[in-house]
Amino acid sequence: FITMSKEKMAKSKGNILKISDFKKKYNGQVLRLALMSTHYSQPLDWNEKLMDDCQRTLDKWYNCYVPVNKKILIQDDDLNPLYDDLNTPGYIAVLHKLYDKAKEGKQEEKEIFITACKFIGLLGQSKEEWDNFKKQNLKLSENDILKKIDDRNKARDKKDYELADKIR
């Protein structure tokens, strides 16, 4: 079952959320990663922090994105968590390790990482498509963001670090 901030989801409690509502705010890949973050036989606590963590993870992973135009085999050792009762959290841990190798910059390591992600339906868009989705869903305009950056820099220049951190 799914809980909403540690409270069981129920129509009577009014804490039911529709996937269509989430898709307005989050990319489908964020939903996918959130759902796979807990083993299918365990309860899932659905909350804003989970979604934000998954969003940040995918943002980080997309920084390593390269198009893969050749067939790359995923090593059995990397797939072992999925062989073990479809342990998706274990496979996500493998993806984090592959990411650590990929971020060192070697093309081959990046291709292995991207292929392993695509195997479970992640990183299926180009970096440009991913960034465009995020821009479309920003609550701040580009001018608002630039103004906040300017305000933050001014606060830092005045050594008002508390204000600068708040603006960030």
Which positions does each model-derived feature cover?
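Basic helix-turn-helix/winged-helix DNA-binding cores
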Residues: 2-3
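Structural preference for alpha-helix termini/caps and helix-kink/transition segments
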Residues: 7-168
